[in-house]
């Protein structure tokens, strides 16, 4: 109603709400239900559920609004949550109806939405994951492990990759697959990645100060990081803060970031190279337009995704594909890291 009030005035907006309330009161009496006003521009009604009745209610509410909008087309939306007759009516039903109404508001073609349990469960799981992760982050239960990169000819550890790990309250490790998508969607992954980057830089500095051997460590950069912050500047600041040569901090960017944000990634890789950092294309072969991208992108190393690694004794397509990829990389003078060979 905010936009309606700006165009037609608060008084006219109040008349719309009064007319909608009258319509719902009439339906309440006719259906032996209960109607109410939630505040702002939200109403609710509890009646026996029938699909035809739902659309009849919507049409009557729409007609009440249409009398006031001068043909501009302010379309109300309605979220419907059917209640199991064997279950007690609780505030949970209201929350589900409000959740469903958000979908209706975003659908300019179909303004009536029926509750979908799977959508609600996904949304609930999303917020639960974020909440629990933030608690774990505050409690110091977010850390990283270093996965070694080994020279296949000599067996020497020549590098490592910093992999984020969430330690559960019981000490178990929670797979990144279960929480990284939610962090990327919410944007919290930027906070996480900066935390991991700084942790690795501090660890490298500590080993150098103790006279211990160090190897370059790969730091993962997501598409969200690229859009949300100046990654090259941040990496340069970390290297300066911990007095590290940039060769010790390798920057891994997923192939999906290359394909989805090619201009931003091109600029980032150029800035990183200017500052002395090397760049890896992670998950090579899992995105789109891989061959065309290799021709244009300025990358130092490619990492083949573990899905291409042949199983024991597999000399079929997987082996042929990975052989072709290695030959292609060699012809382009690109070093290759293969995941999952262990």
Q: What residue spans do the PLM features occupy?
A:
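The catalytic core of metal-dependent phosphodiesterases that act on cyclic dinucleotides
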Residues: 236-312, 326-342
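Active-site core of bacterial EAL-family cyclic-dinucleotide phosphodiesterase domains
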Residues: 125-182, 220, 281, 338
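A short glycine-enriched loop-to-beta-strand structural element that forms part of the catalytic core
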Residues: 37-46, 70-104, 110-116, 215-222
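Catalytic-site-adjacent helices and loops of nucleotide signaling machinery
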Residues: 1-17, 39-40, 172-176, 185, ...
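C-di-GMP signaling machinery
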Residues: 90, 99-145, 153, 182-189, ...
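Alpha-helical scaffold within the catalytic cores of cyclic-nucleotide enzymes
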Residues: 20-25, 53-71, 95-98, 196-206
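Catalytic core of bacterial c-di-GMP phosphodiesterases, primarily the EAL and HD-GYP domains
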Residues: 156-161, 188-264, 339-340
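Conserved long alpha-helical elements within nucleotide-processing catalytic cores of c-di-GMP signaling
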Residues: 1-25, 36-40, 44, 52-55, ...
């Amino acid at each position: 109603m905010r936009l309606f009030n700006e165009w037609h005035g608060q008084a006219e907006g109040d008349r719309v709400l009064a007319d909608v309330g009258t319509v719902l009161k009439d339906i309440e009496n006719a259906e032996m239900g209960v109607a109410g006003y939630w505040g702002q521009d939200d109403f609710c009604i509890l009646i026996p559920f029938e699909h035809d009745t739902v659309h009849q209610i919507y049409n009557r509410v729409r007609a009440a609004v249409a009398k006031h909008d001068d043909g501009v087309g302010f379309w109300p939306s309605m979220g419907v949550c059917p209640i199991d007759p064997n279950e007690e009516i609780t505030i949970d039903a209201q929350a589900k109806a409000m959740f469903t109404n958000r979908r209706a508001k975003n659908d300019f073609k179909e303004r009536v939405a029926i509750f979908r349990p799977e959508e609600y469960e996904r949304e609930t799981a999303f917020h639960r994951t974020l909440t629990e992760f933030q608690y774990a982050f505050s409690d110091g239960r977010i850390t990283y492990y270093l996965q070694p990169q080994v020279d296949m000819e000599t067996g020497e550890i020549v590098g490592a990759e910093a992999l984020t790990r969430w330690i559960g309250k019981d000490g178990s490790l929670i797979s990144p697959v279960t929480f990284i998508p939610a962090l990327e969607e919410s944007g919290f992954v930027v906070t996480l990645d900066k935390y991991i980057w700084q942790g690795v830089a501090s660890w490298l500095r500590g080993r150098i100060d103790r006279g211990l051997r160090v190897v370059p460590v790969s730091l993962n950069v997501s598409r969200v990081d690229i859009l949300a912050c100046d990654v090259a500047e941040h990496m340069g600041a970390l290297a300066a803060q911990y007095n590290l040569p940039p060769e010790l901090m390798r920057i891994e960017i997923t192939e999906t970031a290359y394909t989805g944000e090619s201009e931003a990634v091109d600029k980032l890789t150029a800035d990183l190279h200017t500052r002395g950092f090397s760049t890896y294309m992670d998950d090579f072969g899992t995105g789109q337009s891989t061959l065309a991208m290799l021709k244009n992108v300025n990358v130092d190393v490619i990492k083949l995704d573990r899905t291409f690694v042949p199983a024991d004794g597999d000399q079929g397509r997987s082996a042929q594909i990975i052989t072709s990829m290695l030959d292609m990389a060699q012809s382009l003078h690109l070093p290759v890291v293969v995941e999952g060979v262990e």
